[in-house]
Amino acid sequence: EIEFWQDNELKKISAQKEIILSSGAIGSPQILQTSGIGNSKKLKDLGIEMVHELNGVGENLQDHLMFRPIYKVHGLNSLNKKINSLFGNLMIGLEYVFNRSGPMTMGASQMCMFAKSDPSLELPDLQWHVQPMSMDTLGATKNHDFHAFTPTVSNIRPTSRGYVNIVDKDSRTYAKVKLNYLSTDHDRMVAAKGLKLTRKIVM
């Protein structure tokens, strides 16, 4: 039997076969913990009845920290000013409607590249995603008012580990997420090398 919230109403359904939990790196451990699956001491402290002890639930959280250096360009046009203007957005929309081309047909990044932070490595550990635009933060409502591009670089094999822990028994309460970015010497070194290599490529 499964309990879930829908429109602020707690509902129940039954499954005749297996249940597949697919709520991502944050949601899945949160659901497991509120369901009584996880570290027995942590769950007991929150008043949650233990169903199955599994200490690894919520542990070993891994993520790729992305550094977003921004480079101004001269003599070239980025998408910044076009995206910032009403007329520019109109032209982008018309180009897509009539030609199925332009910025609306692009993916999140227009170029991807891999490299090694250390030549002795068997496989690359650095990845770049390059965008022909720039902004202060991802998801910002306004791009910069100058032409620039963003070569985002990340360590794709970080050694830093974080965790996801619930704070109470209510599954609607956001869990505590600790990412622990750059908590190891290795990750700090790779980050520095990634930014240094980015400058070398661009400049």
Range-by-range predicted roles:
Residues 1-3, 148:
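Short, hydrophobic/aromatic-rich segments at coil-to-beta transitions
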Residues 3, 62, 167:
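Residue-level detector of conserved, well-ordered beta-strand and adjacent loop positions
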Residues 8-23:
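Core beta-strand elements of the Rossmann-like FAD/NAD(P) dinucleotide-binding domain
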Residues 21-22, 52-53, 165, 178:
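Structural recognition of the beta-strand scaffold that forms the well-ordered cores
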Residues 23-24, 35:
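Glycine-rich, N-terminal phosphate-binding loop of Rossmann-like dinucleotide-binding domains
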Residues 29, 39-144:
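Mid-to-C-terminal "cap/lid" subdomains and adjacent gly/pro-rich loops that border
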Residues 46, 101, 108-203:
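C-terminal catalytic lobe of FAD-dependent flavoproteins
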